Structure formats: structure tokens, C-alpha cells
Curated annotation (Swiss-Prot):
Residue stretches of biased makeup (Gly residues): 434-445
Major location category of this protein: membrane
Family statement: Belongs to the Nogo receptor family.
Region (Disordered): 346-447
Record InterPro entries: Cys-rich_flank_reg_C, Leu-rich_rpt, Leu-rich_rpt_typical-subtyp, LRR_dom_sf, LRR_TM_domain-containing
Name of the protein: Reticulon-4 receptor
Keywords, ordered alphabetically: Cell membrane, Cell projection, Disulfide bond, Glycoprotein, GPI-anchor, Leucine-rich repeat, Lipoprotein, Membrane, Receptor, Repeat, Signal
GO molecular function, one term: neuregulin receptor activity
Prodomain residues: 448-473
């Protein structure tokens, strides 16, 4: 029995040695190969300028990071059918052939980060990687995401695209990533979020878009993100954000909107209302404009603080100037002119909304309908209410022709002719101007001053006549 057990032990040792030899024997010279806990070929920071030849076909993990590799040729790892983890980060990769990862059907993690010279990736590069769940493409100098780049990556859960030079998010780029939970897009140059940018991301939990140049978010951009819990939009160029875009985010818990040039006028009211109902954790939303609200948190403002832009509750018509306005360049929605049937929705600052608070303003002579008896209207009835009451006579003194009620004379009080050098002195002209000026007097005051002025000038006129007839003494 002892002799049999001794023979079995030697056989087991021989088998283990053979397994170790099969892994270690073909190991490239600059690498270390081992099989516990997984069969691994490790060649980090060895100054390699190319993918080494002779990598064991049984390798499950290959570490080639921190070298000087600039090119990954097609079929570089085709023999490694069991490969699950491949690290190529921190090299000087400038080109990856489209079929570089062909045959790696079991690959789960691929790290290509910190290759600033890469700049672009062939759309077919990741085809066939059906089990890939983590993909690092951060700090690769990427300028665009080619169409179909992530096609077929149904198992992908983590996608790192931060700190690149991406300027746009093409439609349906992530459409096949139904299991993606983490998407990192911060530190790019993205200027807008279109409607279909995140279409298909039904499982997304975390979306990081901070430190970009986002100035506009489409109202339906987040439509498929019902499971999103974290949204970072800080340090962008957002001056407005449609509340409609946030409405689908029913699971949202963490929202960061700070460090944006928010414009806190009436266009911010929908966002303000949404923030009042939000029960998760959110950053401050400091206003940049108007100046009177600069630095104040939008969430802590009152509804009547958000003034300065005509907003209709019914249909509204955009103001079009024929060129891009400063507001459009900032990503602001255009102010709206109220529909003719809904002018009551234009509010004056400091006045509550009510059915009787109708749009009021200056009515030039001839524009009012005949017989308009709506009561006195003043210059401060304009939508902005910023002009002093003494700036012009009250509009009750301005009547369009033909609008006087029956029984009133249609001709106004007779006015004195203008000053003339032939029949008036300078003092006479000054007296005439004083009697007819005032800026804030009504018609009755002007007409009452004329007879008194005529009486005061009568002796002077008589003296002039006598001087003309009799001559100087």
C-alpha cells in the first residue's frame, strides 16, 4: 500500500510539473508567466515596442501596459481563445487594426486608456466581443465615435470615454448597449446633447457629463434613462435646462448642476419648479444673470423672482430676428410673444398672475378701436413697468381720432402759433413755452393757461403799437 501511494504522489507531481512547464516554457523573454489564480502573461513596463511573439495560447490574462507599443496588428491574439482580460493601457498606440481582437469571444475586460496618440478607432475594432463588460477608452485623444463602434456589445456594463477630445454624440451611438450601467463622458468638448444620443440605455445607472461645453440639452435626450441614479452636468455652458428633459429620470438620486452660466429669468421657471419637487441630492444652481440675482441659488428663489421674459401659458410664437441671438448662442430658449388670445399670461414684475392682469402697454394714436372704454391706462402698465410715471403724459390724454364719445367736441383747444421773430420777443417766446410745457399736465390744464397768458401780454402789445405810431419820445 505504501509503495502504491508513493507512486501516485510522484505521478501527481509529474502532472503538475508538466502543466507548469507547458505554461512557462513558451513565455516571452521580457514577460513573466504563471497559472495561479489564472493563466497569466505579464509584461508591464518592459520597454516593449511591439506585441511580443510567443504568448502562451492558454493565457487567460495578458498585461502589456506601460510599454512603447505603437501598433496592434490584426490577429495579434487570435491564438488566445481563452483570454478574458487584456491590458494595453499607457502605451503609445497610434493604430489598432480592425481585426486586432478577432477571435477573442471570451474577452471581458479591455483597457486601451492613456494612449493619447490613438485619436480614432476603426468601427469594426470591437466586433465579435460579445462578452465584453468593461471597455476603457479614456485619455486616448479620441475626436469622434465612428458609426457602429459599439455595435453588438450587448454585455457591456462599464464604458470609459472621459478626458478625450469628443465634440459630439452621434445619434444611436450607444443603442446596442442595453446592459450598460456606467457611462463616463466627462472632460471632453461636447457642446450639445441631441435627442437620440442615449437611446437604448435602459439600464444606465450613472452618467457623467461634467467638464464639457454642453450648452443645449434636447428635451427628450434622457427619455430612455428611467433607471438613472446619478447625473453630473456641472462645469458646462448651460444657461437653461428644459425640465422636460429631467422628467423621465424617475430613479434619480444625485444631480450636480453647479458651475454653469444659469440665466434665472422666466425661462428658468420650469426647471425651478422641477427642483422644488426633487427629493434627491442636488448641488446649488447659482445664477449668472440677471445681475440682481447673480450668485443666488435658483432653488432658493421665489417664483416671482424669475421675471423678465414674456412667457405664454398657451401657444406662443418665437421671436425671429434673422440671425442667431446672444441667447441662442448661450443655449437659451427664445422668449415667446403671447398668442393674441392669451396676452393675459404676460406678467408685470411684482404683480400676481390673474385673469384680469392683461397685457398692457403704450397705444400709439390711431391704434385703439373706437369707443374703447376700458378705463385709465398709464405708462407703467407696460409689461416691464420700468418707466417713471412722469416720463410722458398719461395715455388717457392721448385719444385716437374718432374715438370720442358723442357729445364731446371733436376739436381740441386752440393752440398758440409758434414763436416768430417778427411779432415776438425772446421773453414772449419763453412765456409761451412755459405756458404750454410741463410734460405731465392734461388738456384741461393747458387750455386754462392760455387765457391767463393772453391777459398778461395785452399791455405789452399795446405799448408796442403806441411806440410804432408815435415813434420814440
Amino acid at each position: 500500500m505504501k509503495r502504491a501511494s508513493a507512486g501516485g504522489s510522484r505521478l501527481l507531481a509529474w502532472v503538475l510539473w508538466l502543466q507548469a512547464w507547458r505554461v512557462a516554457a513558451p513565455c516571452p523573454g521580457a514577460c513573466v508567466c504563471y497559472n495561479e489564480p489564472k493563466v497569466t502573461t505579464s509584461c508591464p513596463q518592459q520597454g516593449l515596442q511591439a506585441v511580443p511573439a510567443g504568448i502562451p495560447a492558454s493565457s487567460q490574462r495578458i498585461f502589456l501596459h506601460g510599454n512603447r507599443i505603437s501598433h496592434v496588428p490584426a490577429a495579434s491574439f487570435r491564438a488566445c481563445r481563452n483570454l478574458t482580460i487584456l491590458w494595453l493601457h499607457s502605451n503609445v498606440l497610434a493604430r489598432i487594426d480592425a481585426a486586432a481582437f478577432a477571435g477573442l469571444a471570451l474577452l471581458e475586460q479591455l483597457d486601451l486608456s492613456d494612449n493619447a496618440q490613438l485619436r480614432s478607432v476603426d468601427p469594426a475594432t470591437f466586433h465579435g466581443l460579445g462578452r465584453l463588460h468593461t471597455l476603457h477608452l479614456d485619455r486616448c485623444g479620441l475626436q469622434e465615435l465612428g458609426p457602429g463602434l459599439f455595435r453588438g456589445l450587448a454585455a457591456l456594463q462599464y464604458l470609459y470615454l472621459q478626458d478625450n477630445a469628443l465634440q459630439a454624440l452621434p445619434d444611436d451611438t450607444f443603442r446596442d448597449l442595453g446592459n450598460l450601467t456606467h457611462l463616463f463622458l466627462h472632460g471632453n468638448r461636447i457642446s450639445s446633447v441631441p435627442e437620440r444620443a442615449f437611446r437604448g440605455l435602459h439600464s444606465l445607472d450613472r452618467l457623467l457629463l461634467h467638464q464639457n461645453r454642453v450648452a443645449h440639452v434636447h428635451p427628450h435626450a434622457f427619455r430612455d434613462l428611467g433607471r438613472l441614479m446619478t447625473l453630473y452636468l456641472f462645469r458646462n455652458n448651460l444657461s437653461a435646462l428644459p425640465a422636460e428633459a429631467l422628467a423621465p429620470l424617475r430613479a434619480l438620486q444625485y444631480l450636480r448642476l453647479n458651475d454653469n452660466p444659469w440665466v434665472c429669468d422666466c425661462r428658468a421657471r420650469p426647471l425651478w419648479a422641477w427642483l422644488q419637487k426633487f427629493r434627491g441630492s442636488s448641488s446649488e444652481v447659482p445664477c449668472s444673470l440677471p445681475q440682481r440675482l447673480a450668485g443666488r441659488d435658483l432653488k432658493r428663489l421665489a417664483a416671482n423672482d424669475l421675471q423678465g421674459c414674456a412667457v405664454a401659458t398657451g401657444p406662443c410664437h418665437p421671436i425671429w430676428t434673422g440671425r442667431a441671438t446672444d441667447e441662442e448662442l448661450l443655449g437659451l430658449p427664445k422668449c415667446c410673444q403671447p398668442d393674441a388670445a392669451d396676452k393675459a399670461s404676460v406678467l408685470e414684475p411684482g404683480r400676481p398672475a390673474s385673469a384680469g392682469n392683461a397685457l398692457k402697454g403704450r397705444v400709439p394714436p390711431g391704434d385703439s378701436p373706437p369707443g374703447n372704454g376700458s378705463g385709465p391706462r398709464h405708462i407703467n402698465d407696460s409689461p416691464f413697468g420700468t418707466l417713471p410715471g412722469s416720463a410722458e403724459p398719461p395715455l388717457t390724454a392721448v385719444r385716437p381720432e374718432g374715438s370720442e364719445p358723442p357729445g364731446f367736441p371733436t376739436s381740441g383747444p386752440r393752440r398758440r402759433p409758434g414763436c416768430s421773430r417778427k411779432n415776438r420777443t425772446r421773453s414772449h417766446c419763453r412765456l409761451g413755452q412755459a405756458g404750454s410745457g410741463g410734460g405731465g399736465t392734461g388738456d384741461s390744464e393747458g387750455s386754462g393757461a392760455l387765457p391767463s397768458l393772453a391777459c398778461s401780454l395785452a399791455p405789452l402789445g399795446l405799448a408796442l403799437v403806441l411806440w410804432t405810431v408815435l415813434g420814440p419820445c
